[in-house]
From Swiss-Prot:
Its EC number is 1.-.-.-. It comes from Bacillus subtilis (strain 168). InterPro entries: NAD(P)-bd_dom_sf, Sc_DH/Rdtase_CS, SDR, SDR_fam. Belongs to the short-chain dehydrogenases/reductases (SDR) family. This is Uncharacterized oxidoreductase YvrD.
Amino acid sequence: MDLQLKEKLVLITGSTSGIGKAAAKSFLQEGAAVIVNGRKQETVDRTIEELSGYGTVHGAAADLSKTDEAAAFIEKVNEIGDIDILVNNLGFFEVKDFADVTDEEWNQYFEVNVMSAVRTSRHFLPKMLAKNSGRILNIASEAGVKPLPTMIPYSMTKTALISLSRGMAEMTKGTNVTVNSVLPGPTWTEGVASYMEGAAQAAGQDTDTFIKDYFKVNEPTSLIQRYATAEEVANTIVFLASDAASAINGTAQRVEGGIIRSL
């Protein structure tokens, strides 16, 4: 299927690793040009170098949890070109007891996981509506509808992203602009690999055995009983950004291997 993404310009926040980087590669393979983003210029430059063989890659480093850096970032993006597709992927998580999470940490979760998407969307959604064309995808999580007791702040922010997406989608009524959220489940990324290695060590098990048993013990409702790959999630992101998904708007698209036991 030709997704008709050639010559589209895609901005993906938090795209120097994990799902964001996989999505950047997938968009490039479909013929789109991509702007990658990370906090550090060196990681942005490295990502550009790694992906440049697949197509046209631009980069803009910024910490989007900070208002001033986000504003400068948006100016730089506008200098690169007119965005057709915005993927708000920036986010982080930490496993921590609820009672131990400080006010400062709660604020950090909100600034990184929610306000980064608000800042970019607040600028680019009106521009998309003005030209009657565009896609916004907010990368949430299955934790947004099935909150995780060991990651309550993270879960809260992902619920907020789902609500943000639906609210913005209501603003697109009758236009050719769509806004959707994507809800990955357990996905194998660099960050997850690091966490699992640490958890296996703490449990006194080798990593391979620990990972093999993880779904049986911790995620028994998963229907695929494995981690999704970042590429599998990226495939859904790219499809929703295409004209082939023009009738899909305001949804929270699950890519969680059936882990949520509801219709």
